[in-house]
Amino acid sequence: MANAPQLPASPQPKDWILGIHAYVPGKSTGKDGQVLTKLSANENPLGTSAAALEARAHAGDPARYPDPDSKDLRAAIGEVHGIDPSRIVMGTGSDELLNLAAQAYAGPGDEVLYVRYGFSVYDIAARRCGAVPVVAPDADYGTDVDALLACVTERTRVVFLANPNNPTGSWLPREEVARLHAGLRSDILLVLDGAYAEYLDPANDDGALDLAVTACNVLVTRTFSKIYGLAGERIGWGTGHPAIVDMLNRIRGPFNISLTGQAAGLAAVRDQAFVEASRRHNAHQRTRFVGKLEALGNHGVRPLPSQANFVLILFEGKVTAEDVYLGLMDYGYITRWLPGQGLPQALRITIGTEAQMDEIADAIRRMCEAAR
């Protein structure tokens, strides 16, 4: 009897890729696939600037490639933020830049450091280049600079800090960001992820963009997905020392900002009135919502202080986070339950419209009272 033919070995991924758990985005549907009001992905409840929508609709011929360098968009970003456009690199969302930063500056055997309850993409960014993710302890769900610095070793190559942090909403003031940077060796890249930075009151500016100008080892990333309301276009940007920008430009995807994305982004960044309106709306509704939740403290409901466009709520009483997550679906809302990030006791809820936040707060109150 003839021997069975030997099948060729199948391609095998690198060992470190097998350790990656795929990113889980906020859901859009609930039980049985019903469409719900989505307050799980931190999108802008005011939508998108009318100017950006108009520019997107007249972006040009989709059969043609976009400007590979996004020159006009970089110039507009530079004008608004006082940055030399040559020191700006564009990304397909800031996620691309976070991954590229790890890829460019870390590799097998190196360490990538971030705080517990940091953005889940940091773990993926570290593992996809073969580096070891190192998680520093938190301080009551916030960033502890001393704990981060204590975790630095001779193998540390990249430190990620989201400010404000996702999913906790915590924020480090300028002095603490500067202290973190001062405590790092100059050969360690500090990535300051400012996806939610535009939601900060200008008086609370954390100094990240200033550090990007003066330091040789700082990369600041920003996104158009949050306050600009352009999540569907996937536009991110970063700034830092020219050598860092050069490295990221070498390995980013070509034509990585679409024709419509460049047109919409250009109009959006010039419409700072929309940005300010979004910031005011968010601050007002967040304060109202948190106040209603704090009134439920005797039921074990604890909203964490937030400087972002969401609130992380801890449920430490009879009603669990899972109870509320499922219960809010019956009211027509999908929120973000976070057991996969070590927060089974917490829900992250995006700040929506006034009516939405009032209805959610009332629903949580009803659930708590029913559990007594």
Curated annotation (Swiss-Prot):
InterPro entries: Aminotransferase_I/II_large, HisP_aminotrans, HistidinolP_aminotransfase, PyrdxlP-dep_Trfase, PyrdxlP-dep_Trfase_major, PyrdxlP-dep_Trfase_small. Pathway: Amino-acid biosynthesis; L-histidine biosynthesis; L-histidine from 5-phospho-alpha-D-ribose 1-diphosphate: step 7/9. SUPFAM superfamilies: PLP-dependent transferases (SSF53383). It catalyses: L-histidinol phosphate + 2-oxoglutarate = 3-(imidazol-4-yl)-2-oxopropyl phosphate + L-glutamate. It comes from the Bacteria. The modification N6-(pyridoxal phosphate)lysine is found at residue 226. The keyword Transferase applies. It is an enzyme of class 2 (transferase). GO terms for molecular function: histidinol-phosphate transaminase activity; pyridoxal phosphate binding. Pfam families: Aminotran_1_2. The keyword Transmembrane helix does not apply. Keywords: Amino-acid biosynthesis, Aminotransferase, Histidine biosynthesis, Pyridoxal phosphate, Transferase. Homodimer. Belongs to the class-II pyridoxal-phosphate-dependent aminotransferase family. Histidinol-phosphate aminotransferase subfamily. This is Histidinol-phosphate aminotransferase. The lineage of its organism: Bacteria, Pseudomonadati, Pseudomonadota, Alphaproteobacteria, Sphingomonadales.
